Design a protein with these regions (language model features):
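Sec/Tat signal peptide C-region and signal peptidase I cleavage site
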Residues: 15-21
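Bacterial N-terminal signal peptides
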Residues: 7-15
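Short, low-complexity polar/charged micro-motifs in intrinsically disordered terminal tails
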Residues: 12, 126-128
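Short, exposed beta-strand-loop hairpins at the edges of beta-sheets
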Residues: 94-96, 101-104, 110-124
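Positively charged n-region of N-terminal signal peptides that target proteins for export
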Residues: 1-4
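Central antiparallel beta-sheet cores of small beta-barrel/beta-sandwich binding domains
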Residues: 24-101, 128
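Short coil-to-beta-strand transition motifs
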Residues: 22, 36, 120-122
Length: 131
């Protein structure tokens, strides 16, 4: 019985470690919106998918600002397709209050975001990793 419990905990630990290893996890700086404001998005696991939560907001001068959107999901239901590609998710644009189907492409410290409506995908810009 002890051996089964230890094996189960070890397997769960390996699965958690594999999930934590996704290279998109971490903090990302968005591109400025139409008002020049930008944010820091924390990408993390949400169950078996990936989501991104707005954790800090900044004004056009780069100073931190208060926002009712802090703590809200900006990206959700994203899944890894391998090779730095992600799809199947949604992205919410707070300044337009619109939600789009989304896909992402990770390349080093750059995360290209696209929002899609009716099969037409629009470049959502390239987010930069925050160290």
């Amino acid at each position: 019985m002890k051996r089964l419990a230890l094996t189960t905990f070890a397997a769960l630990g390996l699965m958690a470690g594999a999930a934590a290893a996704d290279p998109v996890y971490g903090m990302w700086k968005t591109i400025p919106d139409d008002n020049g404001n930008f944010g820091h998005i924390q990408m993390a696991a949400c169950g078996s998918k990936i989501c991104g939560t707005l954790v800090k907001s900044f004004g056009s001068d780069g100073g931190e600002i208060s926002s009712d959107n802090n703590g809200k999901k900006i990206i959700w239901d994203m899944k890894s397709d391998g090779g730095g590609k992600y799809s199947g998710g949604k992205v919410w644009s707070p300044d337009r209050d619109k939600t789009y189907k989304s896909r992402m492409q990770l390349s080093g410290s750059n995360l290209k975001i696209e929002g899609c409506v009716l099969g037409i995908c629009r470049d959502g810009g390239i987010w930069k990793r925050v160290n």
